[in-house]
């Protein structure tokens, strides 16, 4: 597995993946200790395109990513993550709307859990999912980051 740490407006981001594609995008802000597995190899060149696209996203010049992704999860989780990728830039959906879109209308809590376990934040846009009351709800990396990403997209649509 290869990795790189890139800087962003919301702090350092860890990218990890292999020839199959990007497997992880994790926010490192606020983490006191970063444990990178001993068998991972730092490789900036491998993540050059991902870093370029993320920089364009944060600059408001990119609305959708074109990267090879290889998230690991259950079939259900992968169906949720695929549905998240269909939420247009600058828009939001509720957990229930995602559940309906994947043909499991009563599984909105399971959708929330799959959303929380998304290993490739931003690129699989779990930040675009909100509560049925329109409020920001749980985000594994913190509501401040979720709010930042939603405002970034909203401001770039104007």
Curated annotation (Swiss-Prot):
The lineage of its organism: Archaea, Methanobacteriati, Methanobacteriota, Stenosarchaea group, Methanomicrobia. Belongs to the MGMT family. It comes from the Archaea. It is an enzyme of class 2 (transferase). GO terms for biological process: DNA alkylation repair; methylation. The keyword DNA repair applies. PROSITE patterns: MGMT. Its main location: cytoplasm. It is found in: Cytoplasm. This is Methylated-DNA--protein-cysteine methyltransferase. The active site is at 126 (nucleophile). It catalyses: a 6-O-methyl-2'-deoxyguanosine in DNA + L-cysteinyl-[protein] = S-methyl-L-cysteinyl-[protein] + a 2'-deoxyguanosine in DNA; a 4-O-methyl-thymidine in DNA + L-cysteinyl-[protein] = a thymidine in DNA + S-methyl-L-cysteinyl-[protein]. InterPro entries: MethylDNA_cys_MeTrfase_AS (IPR001497), MethylDNA_cys_MeTrfase_DNA-bd (IPR014048), MethylDNA_cys_MeTrfase_DNAb (IPR036217), MethylG_MeTrfase_N (IPR008332), MGMT (IPR023546), MGMT_N_sf (IPR036631), WH-like_DNA-bd_sf (IPR036388). Keywords: Cytoplasm, DNA damage, DNA repair, Methyltransferase, Transferase. Involved in the cellular defense against the biological effects of O6-methylguanine (O6-MeG) and O4-methylthymine (O4-MeT) in DNA. Repairs the methylated nucleobase in DNA by stoichiometrically transferring the methyl group to a cysteine residue in the enzyme. This is a suicide reaction: the enzyme is irreversibly inactivated. One of its GO terms (molecular function) is methylated-DNA-[protein]-cysteine S-methyltransferase activity. It comes from Methanosarcina barkeri (strain Fusaro / DSM 804). Its EC number is 2.1.1.63. GO terms for cellular component: cytoplasm. NCBIfam families: ogt. Signal peptide: none annotated. This enzyme catalyzes only one turnover and therefore is not strictly catalytic. According to one definition, an enzyme is a biocatalyst that acts repeatedly and over many reaction cycles.
């Amino acid at each position: 597995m290869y990795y790189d740490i890139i800087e962003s407006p919301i702090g350092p981001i860890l990218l990890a993946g292999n020839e199959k594609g990007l497997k992880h995008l994790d926010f490192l802000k606020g983490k006191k200790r970063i444990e990178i597995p001993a068998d991972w190899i730092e490789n900036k060149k491998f993540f050059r395109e991902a870093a370029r696209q993320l920089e364009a996203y944060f600059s408001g010049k990119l609305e959708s990513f074109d990267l090879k992704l290889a998230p690991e999860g259950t079939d259900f989780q992968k169906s949720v993550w695929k549905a998240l990728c269909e939420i247009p830039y600058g828009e939001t959906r509720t957990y229930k709307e995602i559940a309906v879109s994947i043909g499991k209308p009563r599984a909105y809590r399971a959708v929330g859990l799959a959303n929380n376990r998304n290993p490739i934040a931003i690129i699989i846009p779990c930040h675009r999912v909100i509560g049925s009351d329109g409020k920001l709800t749980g985000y594994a990396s913190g509501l401040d980051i979720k709010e930042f990403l939603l405002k970034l997209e909203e401001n770039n649509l104007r």
